[in-house]
C-alpha cells in the first residue's frame, strides 16, 4: 500500500493545524501562523472548491488514510441510514488503528497504526494486523502482553484519557457505542466533505 512520506511538519503547516493533534510536529521549529513558502504570508482566500477540498484533506490527514481508502469509506458509509456526514466520520472512527489511539494506548494514530501493523493488537482475542479493520460495537481490543511492558505504552496510558465510547480496563478496551457527532472532531465541517463527493 502506498504511503504519504511527506514531512508531517510541512503537511500540518500547510493545512494550518496539527495532524498529530498534539502539536508535536511543531516542536523542532516555531509554529508559524502563515502558509509555507517564500510568499506564505500572502495566503489567498480559498474558492468554494478549495474550501471543500481543504476540509476533505484535513480529515484524510487526521486519520492517516490515503485517497482510495478515504473515498471507499465514504462510499460504504453512504449506504447507511442516518445523517451522511455523521455516518462517514463514525465509519472512520471504527478503524482499528483509530480505536487503539482513542483508547489511549498510543500517543498518535500513526503510532497506533504501527502497533497494529506489527501484530501487537488483538480483537476479541484474535490478532488483527490491518489498521483499516472496521471494529463493530461490542468488540474488545487488547494490547498483546509483550507490548504492555513497553515504556512508551505505559506512559501513554498515564497521560492520555480514553474516549467516552470506550470502556478501558488495564490493556483492554471495549467499544461500547458509536460516538455522538458532538463528541469528536467538532472543528470539522463534515457537510463540506459530503458536498465534495456528491457534486
UniProtKB/Swiss-Prot annotation:
GO molecular function, one term: rRNA binding
Keywords assigned by UniProt, alphabetized: Ribonucleoprotein, Ribosomal protein, RNA-binding, rRNA-binding
Gene name of the record: rpsD
SMART domains registered for this protein in UniProt: Ribosomal_S4, S4
Function per UniProt: One of the primary rRNA binding proteins, it binds directly to 16S rRNA where it nucleates assembly of the body of the 30S subunit.
Subunit structure: Part of the 30S ribosomal subunit. Contacts protein S5. The interaction surface between S4 and S5 is involved in control of translational fidelity.
Family: Belongs to the universal ribosomal protein uS4 family.
Protein name, as recorded: Small ribosomal subunit protein uS4
InterPro entries documented for this protein: Ribosomal_uS4, Ribosomal_uS4_bac-type, Ribosomal_uS4_CS, Ribosomal_uS4_N, S4_RNA-bd, S4_RNA-bd_sf
Species for this entry: Mycoplasmopsis pulmonis (strain UAB CTIP) (Mycoplasma pulmonis)
One GO cellular component term noted in the UniProt record for this chain: small ribosomal subunit
BP term (GO), one: ribosomal small subunit biogenesis
Span of domain S4 RNA-binding: 94-157
Domain of life: Bacteria
Amino acid at each position: 500500500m502506498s504511503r504519504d512520506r511527506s514531512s508531517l511538519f510541512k503537511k500540518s503547516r500547510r493545512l494550518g493545524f496539527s495532524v498529530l493533534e498534539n502539536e508535536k510536529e511543531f516542536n523542532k521549529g516555531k509554529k508559524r501562523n502563515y502558509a509555507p513558502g517564500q510568499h506564505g504570508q500572502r495566503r489567498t482566500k480559498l474558492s468554494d472548491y478549495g474550501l471543500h477540498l481543504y476540509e476533505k484533506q484535513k480529515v484524510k490527514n487526521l486519520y492517516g488514510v490515503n485517497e482510495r481508502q478515504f473515498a471507499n469509506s465514504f462510499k460504504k458509509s453512504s449506504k447507511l441510514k442516518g445523517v451522511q456526514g455523521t455516518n462517514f466520520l463514525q465509519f472512520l472512527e471504527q478503524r482499528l488503528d483509530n480505536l487503539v489511539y482513542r483508547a489511549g494506548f498510543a500517543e498518535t494514530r500513526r503510532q497506533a497504526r504501527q502497533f497494529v501493523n506489527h501484530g501487537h493488537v488483538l480483537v476479541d482475542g484474535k490478532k488483527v494486523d490491518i489498521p483499516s479493520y472496521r471494529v463493530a460495537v461490542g468488540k474488545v481490543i487488547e494490547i498483546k502482553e509483550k507490548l504492555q511492558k513497553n515504556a512508551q505504552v505505559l506512559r501513554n496510558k498515564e497521560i492520555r484519557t480514553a474516549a467516552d465510547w470506550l470502556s478501558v480496563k488495564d490493556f483492554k478496551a471495549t467499544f461500547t457505542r458509536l460516538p455522538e457527532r458532538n463528541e469528536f472532531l467538532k472543528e470539522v465541517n463534515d457537510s463540506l466533505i459530503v458536498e465534495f463527493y456528491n457534486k
